[in-house]
């Protein structure tokens, strides 16, 4: 996958197109990511001991990884991801600026 947990991304298609967020979790087996504040769904919960009120809460649902693109740390624009080997390690590189995306 071209994005990882903690990456700042922009949604490039779907109902939340143009919105930015940080990846909270990645699910490589399903090719999906959970992005902060994106694809909010209403979750209905029954009253329980922990939450006696119950009710409706909003939470993020995963979206397909092809619908997000990482932000270039140098320019702040969306960018494609390339890969380079630096010091024997494979690192992700922003195609627009050549900046390393991995911390």
From Swiss-Prot:
InterPro entries assigned to the protein according to its UniProt record, in alphabetical order: KOW (IPR005824), Rib_uL2_dom2 (IPR014722), Ribosomal_uL24 (IPR003256), Ribosomal_uL24_CS (IPR005825), Ribosomal_uL24_KOW (IPR041988), Translation_prot_SH3-like_sf (IPR008991)
Covalent S-S links between cysteines: none
MF terms in GO: rRNA binding; structural constituent of ribosome
Domain of life: Bacteria
Single Gene Ontology BP annotation: translation
Keyword rRNA-binding: yes
Region (Disordered): 44-73
GO cellular component: ribonucleoprotein complex; ribosome
Chain intervals with Polar residues compositional bias: 47-56
Keywords: Ribonucleoprotein, Ribosomal protein, RNA-binding, rRNA-binding
Record Pfam families: KOW, ribosomal_L24
Keyword Ribonucleoprotein among UniProt keywords: yes
Subunit details: Part of the 50S ribosomal subunit.
NCBIfam families named among the record's database cross-references: rplX_bact (TIGR01079)
Chain's role: One of two assembly initiator proteins, it binds directly to the 5'-end of the 23S rRNA, where it nucleates assembly of the 50S subunit. One of the proteins that surrounds the polypeptide exit tunnel on the outside of the subunit.
Family: Belongs to the universal ribosomal protein uL24 family.
UniProt-recorded name of the protein: Large ribosomal subunit protein uL24
Species this protein is from: Bacillus pumilus (strain SAFR-032)
């Amino acid at each position: 996958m071209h994005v990882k947990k903690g990456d700042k991304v922009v949604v490039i298609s779907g109902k939340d197109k143009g919105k930015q967020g940080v990846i909270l979790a990645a699910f490589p087996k399903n090719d999906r990511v959970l992005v902060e504040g994106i694809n909010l769904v209403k979750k209905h919960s029954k009253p329980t001991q922990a939450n006696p009120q119950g009710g409706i809460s909003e939470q993020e649902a995963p979206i397909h990884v092809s619908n997000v693109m990482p932000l270039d740390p140098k320019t702040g624009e969306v960018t494609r991801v390339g890969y380079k080997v630096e010091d024997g390690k494979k690192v992700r590189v922003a195609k627009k600026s050549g900046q390393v995306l991995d911390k």
